[in-house]
Amino acid sequence: MNTCKPYCMFSNSGALTIRRLTVAVTMASLAVFASQLQAGESVEDRLSALEQQLAEVEPHARGDEGFSFNTYARSGLLLNNEGKSASGGPYLTPAGSVGGAVGRLGNEPDTYLEAILNYKSVADNGTRSHYRLMIADSTTSSNDWTADDGALNVRQAYVEFSNLAGFTGIFENASLWAGKRFDRDLDFDIHWLDSDVVFLAGTGVGLYDVTFSDAVKSNFSLYGRSFLDFPSDPDTTDGTSDTDNLILTANNYFGNVQWLINGMSAADNDERVVGNVMEAADSGVQTMLAYHGDSFFGLSEGNFSVALLHGQGLGAEVKSLGADGNLHEDAASTRIAVYGTTRLGDSWRIAPTILAETSEDRYVDGDEYQWLTFNTRLANELGANFEMQYEASWQVMDLETEGYEGRGDVDGDYARFTIAPTFKPQVGGFWNRPEIRVFASYSTWDDELNQYDGGDALGQEDFAGSQWTFGTQMEVWF
């Protein structure tokens, strides 16, 4: 599940730094001048003391030292036309079981939050350290106390060193880290779908920003992910074994071009029983070639990204790297992601997205999964604090499962349209938060999709055909 990436990419840290520094200067000035006027010191002494005081508080005001807090959170109600909780989520369709997301606007029934605590310090030799702790929780209950059904969890706990005094040459600007974390650069997402293009997380060690030239740099890392309690006896489905998937990563940048390569190894995972046979992969490879543009496909101001991903074996889960231990030894997947944002005049914004994947021999020999999602988010700014948001999402899928986990073969379309009056402190961009929105959504799909029975929402009670849903939601990050 995606989380919370925009607060990292689209922060207003510059403005916050200025405000912090202004407050710090004011407080320091008042304190120093008040005490020293009483002591009858000279102007020069008072200025010298003030400069020393500012030197002490300025790193904290800039955010270079001390504690800070970040968050991502969303919370809302999603109701059907009978006033009861409705099924929802970007992965509610059969294709969602293999990563096929649809639009999230007016389609999220949960409360999800991340509380991120940071502590930064600078050693006497100039080396910087950053400790981060992320605590996350998720629930679909509307109650205020959800300890029984929540999912409180520590998602990150790591330390990172930068500006290391002993690093020179190509390592002069490098950062060294260890612990449990989301990879800094392999955590970029298509926000409208709540889908990462690629996501790497786990426990390990790495080196960022090995700089070979102004335009060429690389990141290297080793992550571990646990495969727990999988069956290794054909006569039982009980979990009897476990192993670890080790992921060795090289993430390279050549200007706007990104090339990622991952190698994976999970000892004894080939003893896993999937579909009554032991043909699971114990190794794999995944690669991605991406381009990040600073315009809207060269047509107007804005931005865009295009990514082509391919994986085999354990790498056939091309998005959530190393996360799926059931993949077949011959599994192969290819995915493409295209998305961008731009303005259509002074008061309109648009963000189109295409995400598609084809895979074969994914879980059992002979299966084939194909799906494509087209999504567009549109916003019309109507005042200083109000805008109308619209989202249209269409997905087509052809899933031939060969009976994996009792799933049926399905072939069909899903479509959804949402209108969402939205309030915010200031309009002006897709990344301005917080937002408070109300919404109405209409979704429809082919009846055949109800037969998939792979844990998806379609075909469940009160959710077997065309649906209206209504609700409200807040979303915030900083």
Language model segments and positions:
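Gram-negative outer-membrane beta-barrel proteins
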Residues: 77-85, 123, 137-143, 165-167, ...
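Outer-membrane beta-barrel proteins
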Residues: 59, 101-107, 145-147, 193-195, ...
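Detector for outer-membrane/organellar transmembrane beta-barrel domains
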Residues: 215-219, 251-423, 468, 476
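C-terminal closing repeat unit and adjoining cap/tail of repeat-based domains
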Residues: 426-437
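Cleavable N-terminal export/targeting peptides
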Residues: 1-62
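Beta-barrel outer-membrane channel/assembly domains of diderm bacteria
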Residues: 40-172, 210-213, 220, 251, ...
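Residues that flank catalytic or metal-binding motifs in active/ligand-binding sites
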Residues: 113, 153-155, 174, 201-203, ...
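Internal, well-ordered domain-core segments that constitute the primary functional module
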Residues: 170-249
